From Swiss-Prot:
Quaternary state and interactors: Component of the axonemal radial spoke 1 (RS1) and 2 (RS2) complexes, at least composed of spoke head proteins RSPH1, RSPH3B, RSPH9 and the cilia-specific component RSPH4A or sperm-specific component RSPH6A, spoke stalk proteins RSPH14, DNAJB13, DYDC1, ROPN1L and NME5, and the RS1 complex-specific anchor protein IQUB. Interacts with IQUB. Interacts with phosphorylated MAPK1. Interacts with MEK1. Interacts with PKA regulatory subunits PRKAR1A and PRKAR1B. Interacts with RSPH1. Interacts with RSPH4A. Interacts with RSPH6A. Interacts with RSPH9. Interacts with LRRC23.
GO CC field: 9+2 motile cilium; axoneme; extracellular region; radial spoke head; radial spoke head 1; radial spoke head 3; sperm flagellum
Protein source organism: Mus musculus (Mouse)
Record gene name: Rsph3b
Cross-referenced PANTHER family: FLAGELLAR RADIAL SPOKE PROTEIN 3, RADIAL SPOKE HEAD PROTEIN 3 HOMOLOG
Basic and acidic residues: compositionally biased ranges: 91-106, 375-389
One Pfam match: Radial_spoke_3
Biased segments, Basic residues type: 81-90
Protein name: Radial spoke head protein 3 homolog B
Length: 389
């Protein structure tokens, strides 16, 4: 409230102001305001299936909160949506921003400087070398002695001799007390040192006894370990002896049984194997496998050569006989006056060797076409009969 009295204002020389008192409005609404004044805003609806306050699953299980250190998935989704909206808004602003039209065909846009002062743009930046020398490190000055500030006042008092007490009279009891306390403290320290020495000696004796007992315990443990190892070794050795004895007995019994079983079986088996050809004489087998096949091949080759020679000879004989037969038939068909000229003429050749030589080549050509020598002997025999006639 403003002070309206000018005299008071002039007397004080200050400007004062005080506000009018008013009641403070209640910030909290009453629960019946909504009933008295219904809200006209539309009610917002939500799906409780996506409400995080609704517990799903087993109702007996304790609700587990968010694991510390892991981000909230809803918060992450909200941040991603906000980031997406910001990117979309930025793209829309870039599209709405006025741009330079596209250059004409054959030209291109070039960036130029539009500032007031031109600046040279080079590939290499201008570099300038500068040096600066710092001072050497100075020794740290000594720390000044800390003197606390005075908190009281200095007052001086003068005491004359004999005003407080008589030195000879009052110092003697004090001195006796000090000397007595000093002697008593000295005695206590000496007794403490003796007690510590006794404790140290007793501790040393106990340590000696403990070391002896530990050595004895180690000896007994080592002895027990050796006894246990010896026992295990003896048991293992005895088990090996028993195992070997049982194995030997089994082998001996198996050997005796095998000998008894094979006593009558071996001769028959050996006889069958010998008859089957499993046991053979190496020399005889070498002759049968190596020598006899070679011998048979050589014999077959020799017989083949001899049969080829016989076949060639039979064919030669047959050709000669056929030629003779043809000559005699021709002679019988001729008149009687010409028989002598034909047979004994100057151009007549009666030597069979010449005929053989002339007909040898065609006969050799026909050897390969003849199937067998037995078939060639038949016409030869027929020719022989004709010659005999």
């Amino acid at each position: 409230m403003t002070d309206r009295n000018p005299r008071t204002a002039e007397a004080s020389g200050l400007y004062t102001y005080s506000s009018r008192p008013r009641a403070v409005a209640c910030q909290r609404r009453r629960h019946r305001d909504s009933i008295l004044q219904p809200v006209e805003e539309p009610m917002s609806y939500g799906n409780i299936m996506y409400d995080r306050r609704v517990i799903r699953g087993n109702t007996y299980a304790l609700p587990t909160g968010q694991v510390p250190g892991q981000p909230d998935p809803l918060e992450l989704q909200r941040q991603q949506q906000a980031r997406r909206r910001a990117l979309a808004r930025k793209r829309a602003q870039e599209q709405l921003k006025p741009r330079t039209p596209e250059p004409v065909e054959g030209r291109k846009h070039v960036d130029i400087q539009t500032e007031l002062y031109l600046e040279e743009i080079a590939d290499r930046i201008v570099e300038v070398d500068m040096e600066c020398q710092t001072d050497a490190f100075l020794d740290r000055p000594p720390t000044p002695l800390f003197i606390p500030a005075k908190t009281g006042k200095d007052v001086a008092t003068q005491i004359l001799g004999g005003e407080l007490f008589d030195f000879d009279l009052e110092v003697k009891p004090m001195l006796e007390v000090l000397v007595g306390k000093t002697i008593e403290q000295s005695l206590l320290e000496v007794m403490e040192e003796e007690e510590l020495a006794n404790l140290r000696a007793r501790q040393y004796a106990y340590e000696e006894i403990r070391n002896v007992e530990l050595a004895e315990v180690q000896r007994l443990e080592e002895q027990e370990r050796r006894h246990r190892e010896e026992k295990e070794r003896r048991k293992k050795q005895q088990w090996e002896i028993v195992h070997k004895r049982n194995e030997t007995l089994q082998k001996i019994s198996a050997l005796i049984f095998a000998r008894q079983y094979l006593a009558n079986l071996l001769p028959s088996v050996f006889d069958k194997l010998r008859n089957s050809g499993f046991f053979y004489d190496p020399i005889e087998r070498d002759i049968e496998v190596g020598f006899l096949p070679w011998l048979m091949n050589e014999v077959e080759k020799s017989m083949e050569h001899s049969m080829v020679g016989r076949t060639v000879l039979d064919m030669l004989i047959r050709d000669v006989v056929e030629r003779r037969i043809n000559d005699y038939e021709h002679k019988e068909a001729m008149p009687p006056g010409q028989k002598t000229n034909v047979i004994n003429g100057p151009n007549t050749v009666t030597d069979p060797s010449v005929t053989t030589l002339h007909t040898q080549k065609p006969v050799l050509d026909r050897v390969s076409s003849q199937p067998a020598p037995s078939q060639e002997r038949k016409p030869v025999e027929e020719g022989g009969h004709l010659m005999a006639e």
